[in-house]
Amino acid sequence: MLLSLVADELMSNAFSATTMDWSAKQHEYMQRAIEVAEKGRGQVRPNPLVGCILVKDGEVIAEGWHDHLGGLHAEQMAIHDAEEKGHNTNGATAYVTLEPCNHFGRTPPCTEALLWAGISKVVIAHGDPNPIVRGNGISVLENAGIDVETGLLEESAATQMREFLHWCENRRPYVTVKVAVDVNGSVDDLSKDAGRFTSEDCLKEVHRLRKDCCAILVGANTVIRDNPSLTVRLIETEKQPLRIVIDPNNKIKSNSKVLNDGHKTKHLTDDFRGLAAMLDMLGDLEIQRLLVEGGPSTITKFLDQGLVDEFIYVQSNITHESPKLSSFDLTGFTKSVETVWGEEKVTIYTR
């Protein structure tokens, strides 16, 4: 998908949802399309998650999702799935979470695939966020005589694609901060050597979070104190996130794990020009979601400059003997999720 910075004057051409009453069945079909799109999570960046369901005579005959970068798009996979199952797609309705593309990229246009398959109606959750191509897919389909309806579960699709949409609109990554504390809000026990104090099940959720991010960032002090790997280890992944270490004074040791384990690390020393400039640089590298796992100093700098989009607060039930207490100003954030990771309470705040 061709991507560009969203210009304010172009937003007037934005995707507008069809005004209509959707049936319970239609909600069910689109919800299923959103669910199957999740199968591509962590495998398709910088492309978005997309799912597609084909329905004919009131029955789901096929489903597809964007599975990996360079692979079939969701619509193409759904059509292939129908063929594999022996279903005739002529006259079917496609429920797709993102406006079908109408340009040649790593794959041919999805609009052509839908036309070739004889799809008679396309229901779209969310429009293409790129103002240069937005609406072109819809226009091509409508001009070919296909009935197009838009906006079904648009907010749900937007939530699923939030990092992608944020990147398209801002050319910067969506910034998630994750911090773990003891029962009293201490981030570290200074009486002990550095080490994890959360449960194994919580760590697995952290690794799931890491897998969903393009890059992981810490400051020099975290590397010096913890010597972390900052990799995804407890769940399967095809690609490790880029590690970023902010170290303007070049303090970390040359034998640190992040510099010697064979995975990619961007070590920012005298080339560090501030957080805003760094986020611009990461946006140019197609980094769509950045996970900040640094200490209080690094986290506070991100918060003070208004650069955090999501804040994940993980609270253990243990008590540090020699606590390093910290507080974070979350003015402007809203508590969006309360959950549990293993033995830890987790609160997620979003801006």
Predicted segments — roles?
Residues Q43-V44, G70-G71, I138, L152-A180, ...:
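Proteins enriched for Cys/Gly/acidic motifs involved in redox and nucleic-acid/cofactor modification
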Residues H126, M161, S191:
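Short, flexible helix/strand-to-coil boundary loops that buttress conserved ligand/catalytic motifs
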